[in-house]
Swiss-Prot record:
Role description: Involved in transcription antitermination. Required for transcription of ribosomal RNA (rRNA) genes. Binds specifically to the boxA antiterminator sequence of the ribosomal RNA (rrn) operons.
GO CC list: cytosol
Gene designation: nusB
A GO molecular function held by the record: RNA binding
Transmembrane segments annotated in the record for this chain: none
Signal peptide: none
Alphabetical keyword list: RNA-binding, Transcription, Transcription antitermination, Transcription regulation
Entry similarity comment: Belongs to the NusB family.
NCBIfam families named among the record's database cross-references: nusB
A Gene Ontology BP annotation from the UniProt entry: transcription antitermination
Name this protein carries in UniProt: Transcription antitermination protein NusB
Species assigned in the record: Saccharophagus degradans (strain 2-40 / ATCC 43961 / DSM 17024)
InterPro entries linked: NusB-like_sf, NusB_fam, NusB_RsmB_TIM44
Length: 150
């Protein structure tokens, strides 16, 4: 069964919030995940994708941080607001582990999350960093899109 783009978008929305909560609270992932299932209507959410992003990001958080750190223009990780950090980690996870998702979709979804939940203008920061990460991690796909060979 094909999952709708809206269900996948809601999964990203909840995953970002859960990652933020995990980072801020230090609670176990399974506890946070259970709370999301209890406190939210998950009937229109791609629950498998939510689970994958939440646990996938947590499993390789340090590796994901290293993916985008070179593009932070002098900022340290602890200088980035926690919402932006969750968005960047989630997007980098999708870049690296979900190559079935076009890089432009990953960036667009991340920018939308930053607009909705992030600090003022954080979406511009997210867009700039992810454009550079995409060129490094998905170079062939980005270049094909830019030259019209997609």
């Amino acid at each position: 069964m094909k999952v709708s783009a809206a269900a996948r978008g809601r999964a990203r929305h909840f995953a970002m919030q859960a990652l933020y909560q995990w980072e801020m609270s230090g609670n176990a992932l399974h506890v946070i995940e259970a709370e999301f299932h209890t406190d939210n209507d998950m009937s229109k959410v791609d629950v498998e994708y939510f689970h994958e992003i939440l646990h996938g990001v947590a499993a390789i958080k340090s590796t994901l941080d290293e993916t985008f750190k070179p593009f932070l223009t002098g900022l340290r990780l602890d200088e980035i607001d926690p919402v932006s950090l969750a968005v960047l980690r989630q997007a980098c996870y999708e870049f690296e582990k979900r190559v079935d998702v076009p890089y432009k979709v990953v960036i667009n979804e991340a920018v939308n999350l930053a607009k909705k939940f992030g600090a003022a203008d954080s979406h511009k920061f997210i867009n700039g960093v992810l454009d550079k990460v995409a060129l490094r991690v998905r170079k062939d796909e980005v270049e094909a899109m830019r030259t019209g060979r997609s």
